[in-house]
Each structure stands twice: as C-alpha cells, then as structure tokens.
Amino acid sequence: METSAPRAGSQVVATTERHSAACRADPLRVSSRDKLTEMAASTQGNFDGNFESLDLAEFAKKQPWWRKLFGQESGPSAEKYSVATQLFIGGVTGWCTGFIFQNVGKLAATAVGGGFFLLQLANHTGYIKVDWQRVEKDMKKAKEQLKIRKSNQMPTEVRSKAEEVVSFVKKNVLVTGGFFGGFLLGMAS
C-alpha cells in the first residue's frame, strides 16, 4: 500500500532550493552550503548506485579556519559569543595593538627627532642654506589654498566610512569596549 507522504528529505530540498536561488542571484556569494544543496538536488531521484556519500567530518576539516570562526555570514559578534569571550577578545587585541603602537611610536619619534637634529646641525655648520623668504611665500600660498577649499561639509567618502564605523561599534559594543580598554592598557605598559 502506497502512501502520499513525501519522501524523506524532500522538504529540506525545497527550502534549500529557495535559499540557494536567493544566493545564486549574487554571483560573489557562493557558499559550501549551496554546493551541498546542488549536489543533493541533482542526485535526489537518481538511486541507481552511482552516488557518493559525504563525510561531514572530513568536509568540516577542509573548511578554512575563518569560516569556522565567523560562520557563513559574519554578523555582529554579540550573537555568537558570550559577554566574557567578547570582552576578552577585544581586550587582548586592544592590548596588543596598544603595545605595538607605543613601541613603534617611540621609534618613529626618535627617528623624526633625530632627523630634525641632524638638519639643524647641518644648517648651523653651513652645509644647508635655507631660503626663508621662499619658505614664507610657500606657506602663504598653502594658507590661501586651504581657505579656498574650506567648507563645512564632509566629503561623501569620509561620511560613508564614518557611518560604517558607527554601525560596527553599535553592533559590537562589548568587543569595541574591550578593545579600547585593552588599547589603553597596552599604551600604559
């Protein structure tokens, strides 16, 4: 006696076909889930013995590390990790950034200061002659150009980047707070 119940997996194929059709509209966004659904759909009615089983453990091992960490669609980290994990990740990355920033800043300040010192020494000993009238003339010209370009509106590129940063901070408040706290600790150490 035959029943009219759908075959096992037919509902999954129907929902995944809708998802893969939506994702196929964007050619840059091709995920491994889409590949799996296409493979499943193409072999759905073909059980003549020519099919290959898929070992999900092996498939997961072949995925890049960033896919495992961020998932298919990396959204706000607040949805993925606990509060403590977010603060820890933000704090550690902030501390590392602050520590590196402090050490590189010292090196850069030493290099710039040493360069100015050598230029002053060369000027004092007569190796370099500075035409101060020409410097003053160029400074006046630069001031005039700045006055001409001065406006109260930000360029659209700057505005769009600022909006992106604000959106990121709003979505990831804990990670951002941990980062800034860690950055300050890294600068102090």
From Swiss-Prot:
Keywords: Membrane, Mitochondrion, Mitochondrion outer membrane, Nucleus, Phosphoprotein, Transcription, Transcription regulation, Transmembrane, Transmembrane helix. InterPro entries: FUN14 (IPR007014). The modification Phosphoserine is found at S10, S53, S151. The chain crosses the membrane at residues 81-101, 108-128, 165-185. Its main location: mitochondrion. It is a multi-pass membrane protein. It is found in: Mitochondrion outer membrane; Nucleus. Residues 1-80, 129-164 are cytoplasmic. GO terms for cellular component: mitochondrial outer membrane; nucleus. Signal peptide: none annotated. GO terms for biological process: autophagy of mitochondrion; intracellular triglyceride homeostasis; regulation of platelet activation. It comes from the Eukaryota. One of its GO terms (molecular function) is phosphatidylinositol-3,4,5-trisphosphate binding. Pfam families: FUN14. Residues 102-107, 186-189 are mitochondrial intermembrane. Binds directly and specifically 1,2-Diacyl-sn-glycero-3-phospho-(1'-myo-inositol-3',4',5'-bisphosphate) (PIP3) leading to the recruitment of PIP3 to mitochondria and may play a role in the regulation of the platelet activation via AKT/GSK3B/cGMP signaling pathways. May act as transcription factor that regulates SREBP1 (isoform SREBP-1C) expression in order to modulate triglyceride (TG) homeostasis in hepatocytes. Belongs to the FUN14 family. This is FUN14 domain-containing protein 2. It comes from Macaca mulatta (Rhesus macaque). The gene is FUNDC2.
